[in-house]
């Protein structure tokens, strides 16, 4: 059955299905929208007590519900300049060293940092022998993505690609999953060197947005696009630890890359572990 589920993803019209779901999720359908939201909350056991607006009737579209804001103080950010915090509510898929330019996708499946970063060899060199972590956001999770540390945006890269599901089953069976799916790569300069925060698209992920640029996708393209940002001035994008940097409509995966000898992951971190945005993720070395 698992092979059938994975095999079907090669045949379904991924982009067409995603466009359709995106349109439906952004539609203002009144009581029907409310009914769908109520079903989703029950189906995925979504905790609405921590949402700023807990009544499903508040949301005019499903997307508004999906990127719901939390109550003030619901995600306190762990203080300390040396502490890097989790960027999202998620589940740890994989983490560890980047060896020979390769990241672990799942047992028996690796992929290259260079491919993940849109084929940029020079950029990939900045993370040679560094560290990575892959965080999977499930449907029930809070789907805003935040900064794990203070950072100044240097570059944003849109990389076109497929839209396979990114759940654990697919990660274990589709080669180069995260390097073949559509993604938005954000490169930040930090006190401990470069950091990449990559937002990976997936089936029915209708939109990836950034706080400084709005919606990056859709529309979906066939070309890698790059935007460079200044370190100073009116056009500089400087974000503090815990600040929102992007969001998914509907959810997917966040991948972080860190430079060599820059960080050490929290000793309690392990694969399959749920994460809470703002809690300890790593320590600066």
Curated annotation (Swiss-Prot):
EC code: 4.1.1.65
Molecular function as annotated in GO: phosphatidylserine decarboxylase activity
Co-factor binding comment: Binds 1 pyruvoyl group covalently per subunit.
Pfam families listed in its UniProt record: PS_Dcarbxylase
Modification note: Is synthesized initially as an inactive proenzyme. Formation of the active enzyme involves a self-maturation process in which the active site pyruvoyl group is generated from an internal serine residue via an autocatalytic post-translational modification. Two non-identical subunits are generated from the proenzyme in this reaction, and the pyruvate is formed at the N-terminus of the alpha chain, which is derived from the carboxyl end of the proenzyme.
Cofactor(s), by name: pyruvate
One GO CC term, this protein: plasma membrane
Annotated site location: Cleavage (non-hydrolytic): 251-252
Pathway info: Phospholipid metabolism; phosphatidylethanolamine biosynthesis; phosphatidylethanolamine from CDP-diacylglycerol: step 2/2
Catalytic reaction(s) noted: a 1,2-diacyl-sn-glycero-3-phospho-L-serine + H(+) = a 1,2-diacyl-sn-glycero-3-phosphoethanolamine + CO2
Membrane-topology descriptor: Peripheral membrane protein
Active site: 89 (charge relay system), 146 (charge relay system), 252 (charge relay system), 252 (schiff-base intermediate with substrate)
Alphabetical UniProt keywords: Cell membrane, Decarboxylase, Lipid biosynthesis, Lipid metabolism, Lyase, Membrane, Phospholipid biosynthesis, Phospholipid metabolism, Pyruvate, Zymogen
Residues recorded as bearing Pyruvic acid (Ser) in the entry: 252
Subcellular localization(s) per the UniProt record: Cell membrane
Enzyme's top EC category: lyase
GO biological process: phosphatidylethanolamine biosynthetic process
Top-level taxon: Bacteria
Assembly with partners or alone: Heterodimer of a large membrane-associated beta subunit and a small pyruvoyl-containing alpha subunit.
Its job: Catalyzes the formation of phosphatidylethanolamine (PtdEtn) from phosphatidylserine (PtdSer).
Family (UniProt): Belongs to the phosphatidylserine decarboxylase family. PSD-B subfamily. Prokaryotic type I sub-subfamily.
Protein name: Phosphatidylserine decarboxylase proenzyme
Species: Vibrio parahaemolyticus serotype O3:K6 (strain RIMD 2210633)
Gene: psd
